[in-house]
């Protein structure tokens, strides 16, 4: 099972395309949609939904995959639910990059301090990070600097921020999922 978390643009047709691409790895791909506008509510909702889906599923190798803002959530929710994560161009600093787009961006900074202390050290090796060298929205180098000490970081030379095609990375994601 793969749980997919969309980014800020929850209505983008690219989400459906990514779900279809992920079905080449596992036919059981579940999109969990969330508001993107209310961080604390989103955290509680996603934690409850992902936990429920994982409990109901029978896949010991369940994986959570998030793009952009969904990558921010995939890392944290995956850690808290004990499943491996794939982050695609994760928005690690939404409090900086999304003021004016979300109601309370400062809640993201607060959430970051509420997660288990040093959670990345405890989560070491349990996340795969795909970063675009041509991300027109986020500073990929900053993300790599923060995440590379803990996770494998794979650079993509073609994609932009929305990372419309996961196809070149499906084999790597499949191998990462099978390690569970």
UniProtKB/Swiss-Prot annotation:
Gene3D superfamilies documented for this protein: alpha/beta hydrolase (3.40.50.1820)
UniProt xrefs under InterPro entries: AB_hydrolase_fold, UPF0227, UPF0227/Esterase_YqiA
Domain of life of the native organism: Bacteria
A Pfam family this chain is assigned to: UPF0227
Family in the record: Belongs to the UPF0227 family.
Protein name: UPF0227 protein NT01EI_1813
Organism of this sequence: Edwardsiella ictaluri (strain 93-146)
């Amino acid at each position: 099972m793969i749980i997919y978390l969309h980014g800020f643009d929850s209505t983008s047709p690219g989400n459906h395309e990514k779900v279809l691409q992920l079905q080449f790895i596992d036919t059981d791909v579940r999109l969990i949609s969330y508001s993107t506008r209310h961080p604390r509510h989103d955290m509680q909702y996603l934690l409850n939904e992902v936990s429920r889906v994982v409990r109901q599923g029978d896949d010991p190798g369940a994986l959570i995959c998030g793009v952009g803002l969904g990558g921010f959530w995939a890392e944290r929710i995956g850690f808290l639910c004990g499943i491996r994560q794939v982050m695609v161009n994760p928005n690690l600093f939404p409090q900086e990059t999304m003021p004016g787009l979300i109601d309370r961006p400062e809640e993201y900074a607060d959430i970051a301090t509420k997660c288990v202390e040093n959670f990345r050290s405890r989560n070491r090796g349990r996340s795969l990070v795909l970063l675009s060298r041509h991300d027109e929205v986020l500073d990929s180098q900053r993300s790599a600097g923060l995440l590379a000490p803990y996770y494998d970081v794979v650079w993509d030379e073609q994609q932009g921020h929305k990372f419309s095609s996961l196809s070149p990375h499906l084999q790597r994601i499949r191998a990462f999922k099978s390690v569970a």
